């Protein structure tokens, strides 16, 4: 019945993802010592994990009322609000937290993701840019900037950001995939094939994705199909991303296709391919005449 005993059990249950059992033990711990804010924070987080968001929001709100600069409480509360699709409320939580940590990468990055889900891409872009300025080693903000610039149809800016991302393992394959798309839009089919081959080598699942997209139709038969080794497909390096990051990537990718400039540029891309082929035919004809 000791505090340490309950806390120890709670930690084990939490690691095993037995959240309801962990919650019981943390609540027993808190009953014995209500001065531990860290335990109350754990209780709030676990309420969120088991789908009792109302209780979670209440607890985290209480903690922030007493201590407005409680960073961990802000991050957990915003995550729960995002999961409930209460994006405007999540934005407010991040904005309040930024008053106390104005140069925090994670706050700007997460705020950018929330603005993305609000379809406020201009503000999302600002937040990702600030995050990228704060920490130049973490590449995912720049990756998102590449996607947003594609959405706006700014191919040069998008290409710049994706080129910066090719050294980062967690977003490398995706960066090459988008570089291949940009090359196709520009009518640079050879460059597109090279980028596509690297993307598929890094992440074999991208082959099927490309095969299903009209933009890659002119080159899909000329890129390398993924090869399976004895141990199966090459490990996808993007596994280091969180579920939230992967969801945002997919969301931006789909948004580009639905409302962005990529679909509009498919026609331009096809025209560029036709022009390139026509130029080749004309050149061949000139050679034959000579």
Regions found by a protein language model. Give the residues of each.
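Helix-start (N-cap) detector for alpha-helical repeat units in TPR-like alpha-solenoids
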Residues: 3-4, 37-38, 71-72, 105-106, ...
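Register position in tetratricopeptide repeats
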Residues: 15, 49-50, 83-84, 117-118, ...
